[in-house]
Amino acid sequence: MIKNLWNLGLKTADLDADLDFLQKVGATIVLRDTLPVEDDRLDYAIVRLGGVRLLLFPNVIFEDQVPGGVAPGLTHAVFEVDDLDAEYARIKDLGGQVLIEPRFVQAGFGSRRIAFFRSPGGMVFEVMQILESKVD
């Protein structure tokens, strides 16, 4: 079952400019790193603002799964789960369209297993099982 909202994902056209802006607004940078993804690396940052984690990327991991690409702005919600395999099967059985099948990711935030879905109405969300956390 879904435990909680872990973060909101946002695509930005200019990561440095948005980080500067968000710090001025009151955000704290928790982590700035790169995420190895297949044959590429994605720059990202995690900030905390108003008690919420925001994960900022110039490109989102599911970009190639969305016709026409993904516009800058809010892209998806990330929900923490205890058992990714069980939750993946449950959401798929309920009609969630799989965008990214379960996979292992590791970077400055720690290690996780993740999967991405699109709801019947088009909402994109991620389910994530934290294996090791290096950020609060």
Predicted regions and their residues:
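Short secondary-structure capping/turn micro-motifs that flank functional sites
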Residues: 38-39, 57, 63, 107-108
